[in-house]
């Protein structure tokens, strides 16, 4: 019972600090807006609540259970005895190596600075390696195909070619069913694959062979894509919008120049410009002099033309009790091309029928299929599937646009590209806010600005280095052997990095808090930190191994949502493993560099300040330290 009470009183400070730290680190995530906030707000609030409850349990139920369930002496026998003796040997090994690092602190500082600098360099270089994206591509078991047909294509032509594309999807071995939606000059189709447990081939493996077969179909242009892992995306990942008050043709000229540069640089697997000036348009031009000479009524002429080709109903008639619409329209064979309009007869005076060619001519021109606008400005959009990362593709388009576009043109984005621009740039602010919150919490808990620096500097950069390795080794499109155990820099890995800050900080909290307590008991700083690191080794290893073991299954999952879970799991496992190993040796050395002497404060608190000033204690009367040299650490002599 007494042991449980002593242990609870000894750990109440670290438990409170770790609980508040872990809860505070999720606050910036919960406060985010946009897509990231919508995705992770519940995640952050749930974990913050779970951490708080865990802290309450650790301070109340755990001591009670320890007092009633643990028996004295049971740790020396059986399996528990084997585990304890093994850990004692590991602690002795750690103690001997810790002594060496404390005796070679300058080398430790150089190593710490080098690893921290490497972590900064990695996160600066990772986006340039082509591995930054909004979210990792998920195997959703679906492939979409976007159909583009010529502007003058008929619905029958488009359906015929789209059916041929549908057969390509149907012939894939793992096809479950296909779907198709066709319009005169565009369409949409695709396939749904069999469940993940039935098929062995991933969805993306089918894309090259599908594209090769679709490319051989004449009459339409169709490119297969995997749907975005996040909601709100357009048909294609790249959606780069050029807006201006200039006319559409002028904007299109600049867009074609930028698009040509991108194709030359092999930025796109497939690319397109939404504004196409290829729509044939015919206009009936009337000779008003002839119309007046023949006494034609233009309103009646318009009604006659509309009735002939428009397909509008004029009235109803009844047959055998049923009502039917009357829809006048000339035969299709007589309206296949605009020149045939001249053969239409219009009503003249006294119900005379006059050929339209008598009073009108046909004017042909080419216009844009559609005139698009964005933010009340004329807009032209460059879209496509990038051959590089989405971030690299957008960066290239931005650079070329800045070189080509004159003043008065504004760049914008839609779909996944907009999400990447808005959500992908929030990480630094959220990360820094998390560090500030943790620092303030620790400063209040330790009543010091030095101790939070020791905890954060001794753990966070090293954990970031460990997590960054799994993103630094990521190569675009799986072209490297490390692809299975690496992840991209995306919103899931970013949330993992923020979470990692709170998880790895608790290691430093345990060491620093206990070292301060030892100093207040009269132990010198060097002996205090050496003893604190040895004593706190077991709880640090227990919590760290439990964290790694709990997240390791995320690195092994497959199927729906696997990429997102892999991303979080790899960041937490890698960062926690490497961060914990380094923290055990770096934090003690940084403590010697930054921490203040607490044993002087303890003397003053005990009312010894005046006596100390009068006697001027000699150095030899201070608590002496010695290392036994056998790995048992620093002891007070």
Question: Can you say where each PLM-predicted feature lies in the sequence?
Answer:
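Signature of alpha-helical transmembrane segments and their immediate interfacial
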Residues: 9-11, 79-133, 191, 240, ...
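Extracytoplasmic/periplasmic membrane-proximal domains and adjacent transmembrane bundles
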Residues: 252, 257-434, 438, 443, ...
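Transmembrane helices with small-residue packing motifs
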Residues: 29-39, 113-152, 198-201, 234-237, ...
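Alpha-helical membrane-interface segments at transmembrane helix boundaries
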Residues: 4-16, 35-48, 90-106, 127, ...
